[in-house]
Amino acid sequence: MNEAEGMRDKALRVLQVAVAEARGEPGTYVSRARIMQQTNISDLQEFLRIAEFLDEQGFIAEGVNEHEFFVLTLEGIAEGARY
């Protein structure tokens, strides 16, 4: 698995956990700390790279204070629920 594939896999896992945390409701703020804990990501910089990727894809928005809290978009919920 190359680095890009690894990033996509981790981003999908983060998205799936965030969808579960938000109970599938768009616009619901989720916590970076809870998502990091549930996905076993301990490196803040790694999480921030993943969050930026998800933001660029239009799956999350409204990241506050380095994505300490963020919301899922309709597209993000649909993508996270696909798998």
Which residues are covered by each model-predicted region?
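Short alpha-helical segments that sit at the start of domains
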Residues: 1-26
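Short acidic, hydrophobic short linear motifs in intrinsically disordered regions
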Residues: 24-38
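Short amphipathic alpha-helical interaction segments
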Residues: 41-56
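A short, conserved structural fragment
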Residues: 55-65
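Minor-groove-contacting beta-hairpin "wing" of winged helix-turn-helix DNA-binding domains
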Residues: 67-72
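Short, amphipathic alpha-helical interaction segments positioned at domain boundaries
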Residues: 74-83
